[in-house]
Amino acid sequence: MNDNREQLTQQIIDAGRFLYGRGWSPATSSNYSARLDEQRALLTVSGKHKGQLGFDDVLATDLAGNSLEPGKKPSAETLLHTQLYAWNPAIGAVLHTHSVNATVLSRLVRGDRLVLQDYELQKAFAGVTTHEGQVEVPIFDNDQDIARLASRVQPWLEAYPHCPGYLIRGHGLYTWGARMSDALRQVEAFEFLFECELKVLSLSR
């Protein structure tokens, strides 16, 4: 294992421990990845507990989502990761989490997007410099056909290239960043904002 791969794999392992510890990636849910180079990514293998990841639980794939390591099966949602790397070469890490807040809020919001507005913490997202604007988070209906789901995500990415993430209804969050630390920061910001939105909804009823 070369130094770069070892470092990126350790970042994925550390991310899993952090996200599991916060309750945002329970049991074997979720999947994480990091860009290895222009043609390859490292992803968590299918069905592994994210708080207990080891070096053997991460594999290399091409950007079409195909495993480059015989005997290792990538997550069923690998294509949603590699789609992002192929779309934007500046993306270096992608995190998919399954928190209670993201799951519940995605089911409560009517329509195809969640609008975050007037929160100071919006500035935690890459490219956002003020609380005064809106951050639109698309919500896609869950689909076991990942290629079909990816085909619905792609037009949004093209139309809104500064979008910091998206939700899958009743499922979870996808967010990304130039580095793993950036993606983790965005997960944490999203989770704070999701909790705020849920509190607002509960108090307004």
From Swiss-Prot:
Record note on cofactor: Binds 1 zinc ion per subunit.
Matches recorded under InterPro entries: Aldolase_II/adducin_N (IPR001303), Aldolase_II/adducin_N_sf (IPR036409), MethylthioRu-1-P_deHdtase_MtnB (IPR017714)
EC supergroup of this enzyme: lyase
Cofactor(s) of this protein: Zn(2+)
Organism domain of life: Bacteria
One of the record's GO molecular function terms: methylthioribulose 1-phosphate dehydratase activity
Enzyme Commission number, as recorded: 4.2.1.109
Residues reported to bind Zn(2+): H96, H98
Protein name: Methylthioribulose-1-phosphate dehydratase
